[in-house]
Amino acid sequence: MAPSKARSSPAVERRDRLTLAKLASYDDVATDALVDRAYFWTNTRKNRTKYIPVRGIMDDKVAEILLHHVIVAKDTVKAERELLAISGIKKYMAKLPSDREKEWFRRHLRKYIQMYLPDCPFEVTTTNRYTITEHEAAICARKFIKQGQEIKYLSGTLVPMTREEEQDLDLKRKDFSIVMSSRRKTPSFFLGPARFANHDCDANGRLVTRGSEGMQVVATRDIEIGEEITVSYGEDYFGIDNCECLCLTCERAVRNGWAPQVDSEASSTASTPALNDETKSAHGSTSPQKRKYAPDADSDASASPTPQKRRKFSRQYSKLRTEVSLSGDVTAIEPDPEQNTKIAVETTTDVPKDKPATNGVTENESNARVSENQRATSDREPSSPLGVDESQNSSASTAPTSLFDVGIKLEESTEAFTQETLTTTKAGSVADSHGDGDCRQLTAGIEQEALSELSESLELDDKSGTVVKRRKRRTRRQVVPSVEDESHRVRVPGDYTKTSKLLAQSYDRWVECRTCKTWFLQHNSYLTRRECPRCERHSMLYGFQWPKTDKDGPLDDEERVMDHRTVHRFLYPEEEARISRRDRGVSFGVTPTPELSEPRTETEDSEACDERRNTRASRRRTQSLRMTM
């Protein structure tokens, strides 16, 4: 029989397939080179926590390759070859072990190169709607997109995930690109340009699969120029029914995460169960989570609701160990020779006597013998240092671990107990020391482990072998950093734009873009910039004013600016004189979001100050809102 053809082992196939770690590494380098180093005003979120930017990648070099080979010549193959020749990317490619991995990296890099083609209908921008102090990546349309049209170049790569990889991403808060495959019913990790699309309850895009490893975005309705391209992450992704969602649709409707908080709810937060960790909103101060699939049924059954704020853990001791304080000063009490002190011992264990106890001895008899020994000792020593209080026997179900757990308060005394009685072999007995050295056994049957379970106010002195008061040790209180999320701050629609919370320095100011008419924060605004970072970056890359990327036709005589350094990026002195620096652009009481603001009319005379830039209706609305604050 001819031998069958040898198949490759599963280990080799597993080693050759595209894994999550490999795809995450490719995406980090690609976004670092083609997004962050292409005149981008911030750094995009990386998949690896300890990612170090690749050295040897210069912004001017990347922008030159994109301008000449991608934007003007529309030759992505040559642009890819030029980018791979950059020293930083070349060193990274040399570290890849196999040719197959190098091909995977080139294929993923090509997706980001195609974003800069003139016919690409979108571009990467940022928004601080979800986290006010940090800008998250977003996708903005720069061309009109029809309903049902597949958004060109807005794609990504899918890679299957294991359960261990999924849990690791949850711990690192990097689970913002997890999608659930409707066909295979397994989680997959999704990376590429389309991963920058944010969630919206009324999304204008939809994620669809293309092949086994591809993902594309299709427009579900008409998308206008300047509108953010969004997709839906799921019905219960940001809490139950997305109750913590901070999308633009919820902001306009003032619902979910934008809903006003009622005072009665604030007082009952301690008794109100909070959502599970997996359903917490990613739009808060922590890292955003995106496209996270709904948890399994078994995980929901095991999870229990936790309070909004976890109470500080405190160890609760049994009441049997608590001391019963005597009335008055214990040291001032003189023992009455006519009335002897009684000690009631509650125990459920057999107490051995001087002679070995038989099986017929009951628990009551053993307790009676112990009481007789204690009474005889008390009669012989009227001036015993023990000051005790009468106590009654409780039920047999309550078993203290020590004689000192029943309310005995001891004073410091070197005559209390001797070292000899503490070194018994199996059962330790507590003996009372007499003046002439005569020791009589007080109790027996308490094992040696019980000696370590003394009352909290007592301890064993190793030198003298006596039980003395425990000295209070001075402990330095250390502040333990909290691992819990802070309580969610109440969000108000438009609180992320024209707010004073982002004005960290004296010359920081909110400025209105002269191109797209949106407000942006300019740091150190000694001279006012003409355009926002998005429009300025577009002009530096394409040589045209946003959103234009190429000539409209043969009749278009506007020339492309090949050197962005020749463009004046600030306002001229006569324009600067008409700008009011009052309040540094901060808005009080008016929602400054462009989509929510009322339409306004502008004239040449209305540019004297910011207050005159609104219509009469807007001024009336401003006054009414200020009166209600």
Swiss-Prot record:
Record's subcellular location: Nucleus; Chromosome
This protein's UniProt keywords: Chromatin regulator, Chromosome, Methyltransferase, Nucleus, S-adenosyl-L-methionine, Transferase
Top EC class, one word: transferase
InterPro entries: Hist-Lys_N-MTase_N, Set9_fungi, SET_dom, SET_dom_sf, Suv4-20/Set9
Transmembrane segments annotated in the record for this chain: none
Annotated signal peptide: none
One GO CC annotation: nucleus
Reactions it catalyzes: L-lysyl(20)-[histone H4] + 3 S-adenosyl-L-methionine = N(6),N(6),N(6)-trimethyl-L-lysyl(20)-[histone H4] + 3 S-adenosyl-L-homocysteine + 3 H(+)
GO molecular function: histone H4K20 trimethyltransferase activity
Comp. bias regions, Basic and acidic residues: 597-614
Superkingdom as given in the UniProt entry: Eukaryota
SET domain boundaries: 120-234
Enzyme Commission number(s) from the entry: 2.1.1.372
Primary localization: nucleus
Positions with biased composition (Polar residues): 264-274, 338-350, 359-376, 390-400
Ranges for region Disordered: 264-400, 586-629
Family the entry assigns: Belongs to the class V-like SAM-binding methyltransferase superfamily. Histone-lysine methyltransferase family. Suvar4-20 subfamily.
Function: Histone methyltransferase that trimethylates 'Lys-20' of histone H4 to form H4K20me3.
Protein name as annotated: Histone-lysine N-methyltransferase set9
Organism: Aspergillus terreus (strain NIH 2624 / FGSC A1156)
